[in-house]
Amino acid sequence: MFKIFSTKWFRSAPVVATIWIVITAGILVEWNRFVPDLLFHPGL
């Protein structure tokens, strides 16, 4: 594929952790945009 994906710095822990957090945050933001009622439970 791309040469950048095989470099050593791309596979380092801070880069992988940053990408993982960004992807997780994006999924949560989009999920809460379409289904916002699951964030708050007024009956509890």
From Swiss-Prot:
Query: Which is an annotated Pfam family here?
Result: PSI_PsaJ
Q: Describe its membrane topology.
A: Single-pass membrane protein
Q: Which Gene3D superfamilies match?
A: Single helix bin
Question: GO CC: one term?
Answer: plasma membrane-derived thylakoid membrane
Task: Provide the GO biological process annotations.
Answer: photosynthesis
| Swiss-Prot/TrEMBL keywords | Membrane, Photosynthesis, Photosystem I, Thylakoid, Transmembrane, Transmembrane helix
- Membrane spanning segments where? 9-29
Q: Where does this one sit in the cell? A: Cellular thylakoid membrane
Q: What does this protein do?
A: May help in the organization of the PsaE and PsaF subunits.
| NCBIfam families attached to this UniProt entry | PRK02733.1
What's this protein's family per the entry? Belongs to the PsaJ family.
- What is the protein named? Photosystem I reaction center subunit IX
Say which species the protein is native to.
Prochlorococcus marinus (strain SARG / CCMP1375 / SS120)
